[in-house]
């Protein structure tokens, strides 16, 4: 049984929605156990509520120590100036103990993201995230062009060969589109299929 963790941070629910669909795609693969978790919020609760952060997310909070239990980890993050969110960075900065042991070497790592605008850094967020995963010795998996949603030219849409993405709009009012959610499901399924092969 291959174990897949979908681990995300979401301020306003866009990445949370994407994460749920990534997990859905992974669950469609036989022989896979899928876990959906989030990283801890670092903004004090009163401040988070004041700025509209979605604090009532159902996914439980992950710990660094549990990461080696999975064969694949699919990370989700909003973009912060072309990089991952600080909450995800803070979580990953605590994985030095895992790096020392080589605990994540050979495990699959994959990333999906959200941005406020069409050219708001979705690709740089994912590719810069890959650097951390490579230092951990993880095997990077993206979204191949076999996923037809990547070549959809009929609408403004997220989605890259590096990973699924969604465009939230500068004010956060845009929700993930059907095409973006299809790509998210594809990414989850693709990673899960590879995890099964590596675990066998």
Curated annotation (Swiss-Prot):
Return any one Pfam family short name: FMN_red
Q: What organism does this protein naturally occur in? A: Burkholderia ambifaria (strain MC40-6)
Entry's Gene Ontology molecular function annotations: flavin adenine dinucleotide binding; FMN binding; NAD binding; NADH:ubiquinone reductase (non-electrogenic) activity; NADP binding; NADPH dehydrogenase (quinone) activity
Give the UniProt keywords, A-Z. Answer: Flavoprotein, FMN, NAD, NADP, Nucleotide-binding, Oxidoreductase
Q: Which family does it belong to?
A: Belongs to the WrbA family.
What name does this protein carry? NAD(P)H dehydrogenase (quinone)
- Which catalytic reaction applies to this protein? a quinone + NADH + H(+) = a quinol + NAD(+); a quinone + NADPH + H(+) = a quinol + NADP(+)
What's the EC number here?
Answer: 1.6.5.2
Judged by the first EC level, this protein's enzyme class is oxidoreductase
Give me the residues that bind NAD(+), please. 12
| Residues annotated as binding substrate | 99
Q: Which Gene3D superfamilies match?
A: 3.40.50.360
Per the record, its GO cellular-component terms are:
membrane
Which stretches make up the Flavodoxin-like domain?
4-191
The cofactor binding remark recorded in the entry reads:
Binds 1 FMN per monomer.
Residues holding FMN: 10-15, 79-81, 114-120, 135
Cofactor (UniProt): FMN
Recorded superkingdom: Bacteria
